[in-house]
């Protein structure tokens, strides 16, 4: 009977049965990975929400990481971990399961003390165990720390000193912290506590408190753009918080410079320094905020400004000796050392006023503040095309090399098209009120600093001609002309000299007809008939680091000194 019920071999019903099995197994093989992937993503989302809830309520500055950059052990369970979370203020590292325990067990850096503490009263060390920096040495026995493959040894989160487990005695646990190598840059929590108490008592004599910290105390404020340098600023914020007081470190995308700089008003007169981590645009934003402090009558609190260049361009930072771009080639601790060694100098800032023709003077002139340069012509056209495409697809322009390749493409295109030709027929140029006759040019560039176009010394050119001395603090502008994009490229590789038009205290340019590309400090726009007037606005107090001086800087300085001697 059973044999009768079975389908005969080769019958249609047996084929259908086999096809059903095949379809079932195919569906399982397709749907099972989909189900597993969906389940894993759901669990991952739940875990992320759980972590975010802990992060939001925590006093630590927790951040996720998928892979620690060095051998790491959980500070709670002491197990070796590859991924987890770390605090970017105190450096604590834990796995995901120990987050809540770490939050309750360990205290983060306190930006100010809870009790009323005098500045003269030193703080005790704040030790955390394990994960000491590589190549660190014990402050007691001077031997290397962190050599054992386990959670061992201690680090003070303020002075960054390390000590072995066996060297950690009761006397050392109670030892006072001197804030280490960067004590002259750190704002002590006890200082802020005393300031807070003085403000309650309606006292403002902060100089008395500061004098107890020493004349060498020049507290540093970090203003970093987390979006600059392919989001490199985000990581720098955490590294600076570990080395300094977290209250000194600001993300300008969340706290505008005008608000962040109010911290300077709690510091001694003329003592504060600011390190701007970002491109030339971020530096200009900070300097505008400094000008607002002058308007408010806060001149005595104005800081000196240093630059850590991120992104592309960075001609101002190059002029001030900070290099063309930071990509982590030196540790952040060395950056702080460079800031301590830097010298104060002045930087001219200029007002660029653009008055459109027509409109019966009903429109207000557009005003810009210039730190680097103003230009009309092919370089402004390249910047305009680049910015237009970057706004459409910003994710495609996250690489410095790619950005420079795009600039090269537009420069090559303009060599063939020559959209800015016959500029001399479209504009009139006046230097200090005197009209200047122009040859057949495609571009005019007005310089305040030595570098232009991502590292080119435009005013110097090939260096084989005598030229007047150029400085960024003499109240003079250098005006040059270029014959086209190909001429710009030749100047950048020192195969040609620019057409030096002259130097002036005031520059006036009249665009008589047609639309032309213009830019101020790398911010381009298309401009119709107008009058552009450039006059001196103010000085900015900057920090110059001579340690980054290049061979070009040395040769340029020596050449100009020789010229000055012959004159």
From Swiss-Prot:
Q: Which UniProt keywords apply?
A: ATP-binding, Cytoplasm, Disease variant, Hemolytic uremic syndrome, Kinase, Lipid metabolism, Membrane, Metal-binding, Nucleotide-binding, Repeat, Transferase, Transmembrane, Transmembrane helix, Zinc, Zinc-finger
- Return the CDD domains for the record: C1_DGKepsilon_typeIII_rpt1, C1_DGKepsilon_typeIII_rpt2
* One Pfam family it belongs to: DAGK_acc
Pathway where it operates: Lipid metabolism; glycerolipid metabolism
- Which molecular-function annotation in GO is an example for this chain? ATP binding
Consequence of changing residue 439 to G = Decreased diacylglycerol kinase activity toward 1-octadecanoyl-2-(5Z,8Z,11Z,14Z-eicosatetraenoyl)-sn-glycerol
Instruction: Enumerate the transmembrane spans.
Output: 22-42
Stated consequence of mutating residue 438 to S/A/G:
Loss of diacylglycerol kinase activity toward 1-octadecanoyl-2-(5Z,8Z,11Z,14Z-eicosatetraenoyl)-sn-glycerol
Q: Which family does it belong to?
A: Belongs to the eukaryotic diacylglycerol kinase family.
User: What's the protein called, per UniProt?
Assistant: Diacylglycerol kinase epsilon
């Amino acid at each position: 009977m059973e044999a009768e019920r079975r389908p005969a071999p080769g019958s249609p019903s047996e084929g259908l049965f086999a096809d059903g099995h095949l379809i079932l197994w195919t569906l399982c093989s397709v749907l099972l990975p989909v189900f597993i992937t969906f389940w894993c993503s759901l669990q991952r989302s739940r875990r992320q929400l759980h972590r975010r809830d802990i992060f939001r309520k925590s006093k630590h500055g927790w951040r996720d990481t998928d892979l620690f950059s060095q051998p790491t052990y959980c500070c709670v369970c002491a197990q070796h971990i590859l991924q987890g979370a770390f605090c970017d203020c105190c450096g604590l590292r834990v796995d995901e399961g120990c987050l809540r325990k770490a939050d309750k067990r360990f205290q983060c850096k306190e930006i100010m003390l809870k009790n009323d503490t005098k500045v003269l009263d030193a703080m005790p060390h704040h030790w955390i165990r394990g994960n000491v920096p590589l190549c660190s040495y014990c402050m007691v026995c001077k031997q290397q720390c962190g050599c054992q493959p386990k959670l061992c040894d201690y680090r003070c989160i303020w002075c960054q000193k390390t000590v072995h487990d066996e060297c950690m005695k009761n006397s050392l646990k109670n030892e006072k912290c001197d804030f280490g190598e960067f004590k002259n840059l750190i704002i002590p929590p006890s200082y802020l506590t005393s300031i807070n108490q003085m403000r309650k008592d309606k006292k403002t004599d902060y100089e008395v408190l500061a004098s107890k910290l020493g004349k060498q105390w020049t507290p540093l404020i970090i203003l970093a753009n987390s979006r600059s340098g392919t989001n490199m600023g985000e990581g720098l914020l955490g590294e600076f918080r570990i080395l300094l007081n977290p209250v000194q470190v600001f993300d300008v995308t969340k706290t505008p410079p005008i608000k962040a700089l109010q911290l300077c008003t709690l510091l001694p007169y003329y003592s504060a320094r600011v390190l701007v981590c970002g491109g030339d645009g971020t530096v200009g934003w900070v300097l505008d905020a400094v000008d607002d402090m002058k308007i408010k009558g806060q001149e005595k609190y104005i800081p000196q400004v240093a630059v850590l260049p991120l992104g592309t361009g960075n001609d101002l930072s190059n002029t001030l000796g900070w290099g063309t771009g930071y990509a982590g080639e030196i540790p952040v601790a060395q950056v702080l050392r460079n800031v301590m060694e830097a010298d104060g100098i002045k930087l001219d800032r200029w007002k660029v006023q653009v008055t459109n023709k027509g409109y019966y003077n009903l429109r207000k002139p557009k005003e810009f503040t210039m730190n680097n340069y103003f230009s009309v012509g092919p370089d402004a056209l390249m910047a305009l095309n680049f910015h237009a495409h970057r706004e459409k697809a910003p994710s495609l322009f996250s690489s410095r090399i790619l950005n420079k390749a795009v600039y090269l493409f537009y420069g090559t295109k303009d060599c063939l098209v020559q959209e800015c030709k016959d500029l001399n027929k479209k504009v009139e140029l006046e230097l200090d009120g005197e009209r200047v006759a122009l040859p057949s040019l495609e571009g005019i560039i007005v310089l305040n600093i030595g570098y232009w176009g991502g590292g080119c010394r435009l005013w110097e050119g090939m260096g084989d001609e005598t030229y007047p001395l150029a400085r960024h603090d003499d109240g003079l502008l250098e005006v040059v002309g270029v014959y086209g994009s190909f001429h710009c490229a030749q100047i950048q590789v020192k195969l040609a000299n620019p057409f030096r038009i002259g130097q002036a205290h005031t520059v006036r340019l009249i665009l008589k007809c047609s639309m032309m590309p213009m830019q101020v400090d790398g911010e381009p726009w298309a401009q119709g008939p107008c009058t552009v007037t450039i006059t001196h606005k103010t000085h900015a107090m900057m920090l110059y680091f001579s340690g980054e001086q290049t061979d070009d800087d040395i040769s340029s300085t020596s050449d100009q000194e020789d010229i000055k001697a012959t004159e």
